[in-house]
């Protein structure tokens, strides 16, 4: 699988604090290797939009779509509690 980013996700990623950015990159490696990696806690977030959610850390989540053999990261946001 490959990883791609929307402009929105890239903009957010460039402004994240370094520890959050590093945690995201670590999780992105896990995502590319195995969607079901335990630390991702990946789940289908919206069936109608075919949108998935995964964990960056306890306070941050990222959202992505699966298109062919590519994961497209659409958003990286604080966890909506």
Spans of features found by a protein language model:
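A small-molecule sensor/coupling module
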Residues: 27
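A short, surface-exposed loop/turn module that caps and links secondary-structure elements
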Residues: 30-54
């Amino acid at each position: 699988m490959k990883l791609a980013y929307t402009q929105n996700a890239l903009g957010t990623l460039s402004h994240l604090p370094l520890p959050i950015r590093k945690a995201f990159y670590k999780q992105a490696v896990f995502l590319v290797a195995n969607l079901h990696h335990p630390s991702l806690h990946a789940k289908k977030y919206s069936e109608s939009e075919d949108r998935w959610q995964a964990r960056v850390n306890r306070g941050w989540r990222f959202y992505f779509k699966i298109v062919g053999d590519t994961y497209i990261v659409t958003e990286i946001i604080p966890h909506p509690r």
